[in-house]
Amino acid sequence: MITRLLSGSIKSKGLSYKLLDELNEELLEDVDIFVETGVYSMIPANILSKPRICSLGFHETPLPEGKGWAPIRWTLENNKKHLVVSLYQLSEKLDDGGIVYQVNVPISKGDHYPVLETKRQKGIQECFSLFLDELQSGVLVIRPQTGEECFSDRRFKHSSELDATKTLKELWDEIRVCDLERYPPYFVLDDIKVVLNYKVIKLGDI
């Protein structure tokens, strides 16, 4: 999905691109900029240094805050009003390169996982499109990350378990960050597991 959005932005600017099914130095010959999406492992230095200009990636937190996994969860846990999409230069360290562009995507208290995921994708597309505009105007500014560094842990299936002693209002941020199809929220009651399914409806629409 993200790849399709980015390729659409590239084509709309009249630029050329190629999609890579694997990472090797030969495939990056004659490439100016390499952009990774959906790569969940560190990319070797020989790959990152191959493009003529730079290698870039996206992370949905205001780097250096929220490095690592589960950026949407980090955003909610830290009571942020926006999902911040950072386009940054890839390096040998995790989420450590300079910032190329950042976009703030407003989020509301009623946004649950499908809405948050859609906003994330649109934020990435907007961020990338604005970056391309600047690039075509002859501008490419890479700023060092500033601020306090912190990391977010990886989510697993058990990360969707809720504390049954808390109220639904207290649990809402934990509930809405769960993917209902893959990792639905649940709680354990004595010897049974209760899996939650829900729908968000604005009161004015009832």
Regions found by a protein language model. Name each.
Residues 1-206:
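One-carbon transfer enzymes
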